Amino acid sequence: MQLPHYSQLKQQQCRRDRRSLALLLAFLVLTLVVSLCAGERWIWPTAWLDDAQQLFVWQLRLPRTLAVMLVGASLAMSGTVMQAVFDNPLAEPGLLGVANGAGVALVLTVLLGQGLLPVWVLSLSAIAGALLITFLLLHFARRHISNTRLLLIGIALGIICSAVMTWAVYFSTSLDLRQLMYWMMGGFSGIDWRHGWLMLTLLPLLLWLSRQGTVLNGLTLGEIQARQLGIPVYRWRTVLVLVMGVQVGLSVALAGIIAFIGLIIPHMLRLCGLTDQRYLLTGCALAGGGVLLLADTVARVALNSAELPIGVVTATQGSPWFIWLLLRNRL
């Protein structure tokens, strides 16, 4: 009698998860529409095809909106993967220094290249920096140190990278590098269709990662249980770290360092009952894109004469969550 009962519970959970994904999809569509409407001038959807509004909507706002959505999805999914791979509920690209590693590589490349290098070289340097920090963290994680120490190591690496970026900007006379430092606070100003190749590179990685829920379910059980299930743990960790590093590097190349999205989104969804990684990954992509679209809209319209760095908005949103998670996990 227990098997039918278990089967019914599993079916009910699947239906709840699908309903949650449907609600998250509706939330993403709503925030996408608001993002396209909002700006110095509010443009209703009925006016999007007007000749006078096409430049604002299709050439300026649409590429930015797509970039925000993809970066939000990338950071939220990367946070979910990091929490599973490192077995640390507080792991996320910004907090563990991965995004800062991408940023310092980008700044040093601009400094050494004197602002003359093409965008694809800067993107590759950001990816390399993110991968370097991620593999360092993976090395420490394999030494079975505590979650607290791994968290502190990640924070220390992030502080070191931030210090290097600050020194580079302080001693630089290049206006490009000073503007880049402002951009490293997080922002999507200047995004247009010329950055479309970065978005197209990010999209297949997101789609592939969203299909790896079964593997992540095994990894969350622990290394021994995962091996008993036939999962090649070392190989999957390496592959997931590579994909995650590339995603974070591309995200930093597009928008700079944006913290806390990878931390708060997975925990919010888990608190809402979305615990199966097969649904959680997709949910993180939808929720991450929607939340970052909201933050970007706030950053654009909060001030009349300027634009807030989106990293400031997400840090304001995420800092209370981080404190709460620290207290909840008694670290």
UniProtKB/Swiss-Prot annotation:
Its main location: membrane. One of its GO terms (cellular component) is plasma membrane. GO terms for biological process: cobalamin transport. It is found in: Cell inner membrane. CDD domains: TM_ABC_iron-siderophores_like (cd06550). The chain crosses the membrane at residues 21-43, 63-85, 90-112, 116-138, 151-173, 193-210, 239-261. Keywords: Cell inner membrane, Cell membrane, Membrane, Transmembrane, Transmembrane helix, Transport. GO terms for molecular function: vitamin transmembrane transporter activity. InterPro entries: ABC_BtuC-like, ABC_transptr_BtuC, ABC_transptr_permease_BtuC. The keyword Transmembrane applies. It is a multi-pass membrane protein. The keyword Cell inner membrane applies. It comes from the Bacteria. Part of the ABC transporter complex BtuCDF involved in vitamin B12 import. Involved in the translocation of the substrate across the membrane. The complex is composed of two ATP-binding proteins (BtuD), two transmembrane proteins (BtuC) and a solute-binding protein (BtuF). NCBIfam families: PRK03784.1. Belongs to the binding-protein-dependent transport system permease family. FecCD subfamily. This is Vitamin B12 import system permease protein BtuC. It comes from Pectobacterium atrosepticum (strain SCRI 1043 / ATCC BAA-672) (Erwinia carotovora subsp. atroseptica).
